[in-house]
Every structure is written in structure tokens, then in C-alpha cells.
Amino acid sequence: MKLAVILPAYCAEAYLPECLDSILNQTFRDFFIIAVNDASKDKTGEILKAYAARDSRLQVFHLPENRGEPFVCQFAMDMLKDVEVEYVARMDADDICTLDRFEKQIQFLDSHPEIDIVGSQATLFFDDQSGREPALSNMPLLDKDIKAFLSLASQNMFNPTTMWRHDSIKNLGINYTATETAPDFHMWVQCALHGKTFANLPEPLLFYRIHQAQESKKRDKINRSVQYTMELWISHLFPDLNATEVTLLSHILYEKQLRLTTEELKTIFAAYDRISKDRSISLFGEDRNTMFDMIDNFFNFLKSRLKFT
């Protein structure tokens, strides 16, 4: 088959039918789905079973206990290791694909052999009664800019919009369970460190659902996981930084909160002044001018707030 789709599902009964309908009714038909029910406590498993009975492209696996998204991703990727499939796509159980998503991304990858991973924009909509209007994401389109935005742990790749070349990624041996959560960001950093290339399509190919408490319940896990991956990325981007400087710079670029001591901030500013002098070097294809411009703006704002000179 041309495409495999990884679909983790946990307690998603309210959204799963709409998600599955959007996948199974794609204009591109040559794919199968690996849906992993992560020991859901609701009717997620029953919904998956019912859909699988109607469409043989849906393969369902039920975990006996809840293991979390990193384990589910590792489970699915391990299952695909020996499968002859050209591309792999990600999807989340509470989101909705446009019906031409797979067709457009496959056309792009078929015609751009230099790109390993492609995402797209997304329409963000709110799962509440607030009446807030949907919003359109503004992800960078080019590899050099996507890698620049990795340094802020934001606005790089929208995980449930992504599709990648199976042979290109499976041989990297990525450990998706290296972090407690946020395995997607860890994957993108690992891919960048191995010289893989990214692109985002300009059109929105996904409706991304934002619902209350979507991240609040696991905020500490997210912070620890992203910090771990940020340190991995920053340490390779700037090999001259020592371990303390890497940790502090990673922390403030991701969390962007003033929780550090004055001495820690002085350490960060001094380290940044040192590494930002030469902007001509690009170790992994990142646009350092774009990257440093973004960090400059943030640091200048920070210094003005703190009255640093």
C-alpha cells in the first residue's frame, strides 16, 4: 500500500466518529489505519470495533493498560518496521481531516523527493460555547524556517497534519518513549539532527479541535518533555555552550517565563551574546538569521522588562 495512518485513541468517544469518517472518506483510497486504543475507559474501543467491521482498512489494537502517547507511537512505528509502505501519516482522534488531505500531501511528496516530512496549516476551532471564531495557523513553509522555529518549540510542525517517507524515518531508530509526552516534538528534533528535511503546505488540511483542559492536566509532563528535547536541540545547535547554559537557554526559550534568578538570567544573556555573533553558520539547514531575529526580539523585550543593560 502507499500509505499507513497512525491513530492513537484514548477516551475519544465524543470525537472519534467524526475523525474516522474524515479519514475513511478521503479522496485518496490506498491506505490502511493502525488505530491504537490506549485502554480507554469510555466507548472508544467499541466505536473502533464497529468501524473496523465495516472497513477492512482499519486495523485496531487494544492495549490492556493505559501507556500514554509516546508508548503508543513507539508501538505503531515498531509494527510498521517491516511493512512495505511508502508514506506514514499521523492523525489525532479528536481532529478532522479535510477529505483531500492525503491526496494533496502524497502529490507533494511524490513531486518533491528532497522533502522527508510534510505538514500543513490547520483550522483551529474551539470545542465550547464561547462563540469564538475559528483561526488559521501560520506555520512556516520552508525547511530552513521550520528548523529555525524548532528553537522556540513552537510554530514548526502541526503533529496531526504530518506525513513522512517511511524508509527515510524508520532507519533512524528514534526512541519515541524518551519523553513522558510530546513525542512529536522529540521526533522532529531527532529528524532535524539527522539531516531530514521539512515542508508545510500553505493550505489548511486539518480542523484542529481546542477543548478546555486539553493540556492543563499534563502541563508538568509537557514542560519536562519539551525541556528535555530542547536541551538536545540547543546543545547540538550551539556546541560551545556548557551544560548549565544549555539548560537555562532551553528553559527560557520554551517557557518564556520569568522564573529564573538574576544570576541565571545574566548567565543566559552572556551566553547568548557569545553564540549570536556569528550568524553565517547553519549546522542542520536552519536559517540562523530568522532564528536569531526571533530570539533577539524576545530577549530585547525581556531585558526591557527586567531593566537589564
PLM regions with names:
Residues 15-17, 42-50, 96, 100:
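Acidic helix N-cap motif at the loop->helix transition within catalytic regions
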Residues 37-46, 65, 92:
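A conserved acidic beta->alpha catalytic loop
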Residues 63-83, 88, 104:
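Glycine-rich, basic loop-to-helix element that forms the pyrophosphate-binding segment
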Residues 100-134:
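Conserved donor NDP-sugar-binding/catalytic core segment of glycosyltransferases
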Residues 193, 198, 210-309:
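C-terminal subregions of glycosyltransferases and related glycan-biosynthesis enzymes
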